[in-house]
Amino acid sequence: MEYVTLNNGIKMPKLGYGVYQTPPEDTKRCVLDAIEVGYRSIDTAQAYGNEEGVGQALAECGLPREEFFLTTKVWITNAGYEKAKASIEDSMQKLGTDYLDLLLIHQPFGDYYGTYRAMEEFYEAGKIRAIGVSSFGPDRYLDIEHFANIKPAINQVETHVFQQQKVAKEY
């Protein structure tokens, strides 16, 4: 497995298994299959509605939690300090873990400043190993970077032939 080292020294696998659009009733089986063929980085999100299936797979796979790099994202309906804190605790409960390897703000909408403050607190408490953002354009990324006490470790951006993200790449 190849890794990238984040800005805080945490090593993240370059290849991960994402469960976007995986129906909740299929998530456990799909993640168990992914683990069986060697995936150790699992990417989910509150908005996907399948965190519980990921947690069930991790609990049933027979491997220790430390073998995995687990990522989830705070959805825009949970933006703001208090709502984000509650949603992070809820995500950890659904995932069956007492820590996350990476937590991202899913999109730059709502009070993402409050969301990021909540994430920083979890990071400082040792409940999150790395924090960052997702789908932030260069302007929003610079904004949060200047606001943050803890710089984002990553800006996860969807990239494919139909969405090439040329501006984000140039930045």
Describe every region a protein language model picked out:
Residues Y20-T22, A45-A47, K73-T77, I105-P108, ...:
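Active-site beta-loop-alpha junctions enriched in small/polar residues
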Residues E60-E67, L95-T97, Y123-K127, F147-K151:
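Short helix-capping segments at alpha-helix termini
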Residues Q107-Y171:
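Beta/alpha (TIM)-barrel catalytic core signal, keyed to glycine-rich beta->alpha loops juxtaposed to Asp/Glu
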